[in-house]
Design a protein with these regions (language model features):
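Short hydrophobic/aromatic-enriched beta-strand-loop microsegments
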Residues: 9, 259-264, 310-317
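Basic, amphipathic juxtamembrane/active-site segments
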Residues: 199-223, 308-315
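Substrate-recognition element of Asp-dependent hydrolases with the DxDx(T/V) motif
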Residues: 220-251, 266, 399-404, 408-409, ...
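Conserved Lys-Pro-Asp/Glu-containing loop-to-beta segment of HAD-superfamily phosphomonoesterases
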Residues: 276-297, 303
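Acyl-donor binding region in acyl/amide transferases
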Residues: 425-428, 434-510
Length: 541
């Protein structure tokens, strides 16, 4: 976690007191004020297994008893602390008294039923996440997962090897919850996506497909990359090749990755750190969003030295590529939204917009030509997950970089003391999805803007002005007279340092820790823009 920029402090409950400390008042934990709670359980904590040949109804009853116990803890923790919670599913014992029949009648069968029920339970509780202990135990191997000597002497539920595996996986999940997952995978080509060098070996000399073990390993790696792309990870190429040779390699009949799979292709002989900086500029993303994969250690060393915020992975040998990238956990997700599934198409549409802009002599004429339409409306349940995701991963156009849980998004939406707005922008090139959020806390005649953010994909389209106009209208309807905006500087959000000034706010106070701005709504007039706004009540969109 330290390597990913997190320096946590910990509260640890007494041994085997997880239920009591979760379900009842816990002053020490309340004073600690956790941002995240981890409930570590295993199959050893299962209170009661069904008897052999127990009827289906009895098994179902025991499953429900375990789920009721877990739900009591979850509800209590969510009510008292309003933070994210991680809970394990159940691993398997290292022994099977029924042998292979255990999967049909014994403990294995019951644990599988518990894990299925747990998935259903967690889906009913926002901001609760599952650590897949069942998978981790299989990854280590059950014979190595449980150390009977450690258990009987020290009550360790797993071996040291198992503990290390859990700790690493827990750090990946924690980083994902707090918005630290990466967004872009930058790939070299020669001897990374395929074997060989296209400029020297030609198309026929490239190693890819099923003709050899090496060829199969490269094909498998490309299939894995496509899986990442399909769930929203952006792909880019950074290769020392001519652009023509890069496209030639991607045209190979066994190549699974095609030019259309990449949000950006940089194939030239510039230093790779400069190309990566250019990719970041074109995609409007910070360098800390990138993972760089290259078989050449010299290129990896260059990028690590020049761009320390870029994650650089030692990818190993071709047969290790998938394992090393997967186990690094850079792209760990906590949810999947429609925006994730459409992300590559959205960035490709952005490229079309950039090309179209060159045809206009004035930027205003370009904006008018986009035929932009936006829904700017209060939060609603269908989009809670996307809103939490956007809040937790937006760093640059974000005035406060306040993070939240899914439960907090739900609370804001339902509270009469909050104004919530989201912005979804569409134009003639496509749907950008939900790309802007504002959250204001009402205090008398003042609305404090705790969150104001926007995706960098829609910079310079004036959506922020449309959002401000809608917010001001809603605030006036609630008899609010003053908006207060807050800017808390970070290494990444300098682009919004003057946002409230540009909105017409007056600077009230300024310190190293942040600035406070104020807007008198009685004097405020709407900002002009080129967006047709729907407040969510009209079907004309």
């Amino acid at each position: 976690m330290l390597q990913r920029g997190m320096a946590p402090s910990f509260y640890e409950s007494d041994y085997n007191r997880y239920y009591e400390e979760s379900a009842f008042e816990n002053p020490p934990l309340k004073d600690f004020a956790p941002d995240l709670i981890y409930l570590h359980t295993s199959w050893l904590n299962i209170a009661c297994f069904p008897k052999l040949n127990a009827p289906t109804e009895e098994i179902a009853k025991l499953v429900q008893q375990e789920m009721n116990k877990l739900e009591i803890m979850l509800i209590s923790l969510k009510t008292r602390y309003s933070c994210a919670i991680i809970i394990n599913n159940f691993d398997l014992p290292s022994h099977r008294s029924l042998g292979n029949l255990d999967n049909l009648e014994g403990k294995t069968h019951f644990i599988n039923a518990l894990n299925t029920a747990l998935i259903k339970l967690v889906k009913e509780h926002p901001s609760v996440y599952v650590q897949d202990l069942l998978y981790l135990s299989a990854q280590v191997g059950l014979s190595k997962w449980f150390d009977s000597n450690l258990y009987y002497r020290a009550k360790y539920a797993m071996s040291y090897e198992g503990l290390a595996c859990v700790a690493l996986n827990l750090s990946k999940l924690t980083c994902a919850i707090f918005g630290l997952s990466k967004k872009v995978l930058i790939l070299d080509m020669d001897n990374t996506l395929y074997g060989g060098v296209v400029a020297d070996d030609g198309l026929a000399g490239l190693v890819i497909g099923s003709e050899s073990a090496l060829a199969e390993s490269y094909s498998a790696f490309q299939r894995y990359i496509l899986e990442l792309k399909e769930r929203g990870v952006l792909l880019a190429i950074c290769s020392k090749n001519t652009h023509e040779n890069a496209l030639l390699a991607l045209s190979h009949e066994n190549m699974l990755l095609k030019p259309s799979d990449f949000a950006c292709i940089k194939a030239n002989f510039e230093p790779k750190d400069r190309n990566i900086e250019q990719i970041a500029k074109e995609l409007n993303l910070g360098l800390d969003s990138f993972v760089f994969v290259d078989d050449n250690p010299a290129e990896r060393a260059l990028v690590s030295a020049q761009l320390p915020s870029v994650a650089v992975l030692d990818i190993g040998q071709p047969e290790e590529y998938i394992t090393r990238l997967d186990e690094a956990g850079y792209f760990e997700p906590i949810s999947l939204s429609q925006e994730d599934l459409a992300r590559v198409a959205q960035y490709q549409a952005n490229a079309k917009r950039q090309n179209a802009q060159q045809q206009f002599s004035s930027y205003a004429a370009f904006l008018q030509s986009l035929e932009m339409r936006a829904v700017i409306a209060p939060f609603h349940p269908n989009i809670f997950e996307r809103l939490a995701q956007l809040i937790n991963k937006t760093n640059q156009f974000n005035c406060t970089t306040k993070r939240c849980t899914l439960a907090q998004v739900q609370e804001w939406a339902q509270s009469p003391t909050y104004i919530t707005l989201y912005g979804q922008l569409v134009d003639k090139f496509g749907d950008n999805g939900i790309v802007a959020i504002s959250v204001g806390r009402i205090e008398g005649e003042i609305c404090h803007l705790e969150i104001w953010l926007m995706s960098c994909r829609v910079l310079k389209r004036d959506l922020e002005f449309a959002m401000l106009n809608s917010l001001a209208k809603r605030a006036r309807e609630l008899s609010i007279k003053t908006l207060k905006g807050y800017y808390y500087p970070t290494p990444k959000n300098a682009m919004v340092a003057q946002l409230y000034t540009n909105f017409g706010f007056t600077l009230q106070s300024q310190a190293e820790s942040g600035s406070v701005f104020s807007l008198d709504l009685e004097k405020h007039t709407d900002k002009p823009h080129y967006i047709k706004v729907n407040d969510g009540t009209s079907t004309d969109f």
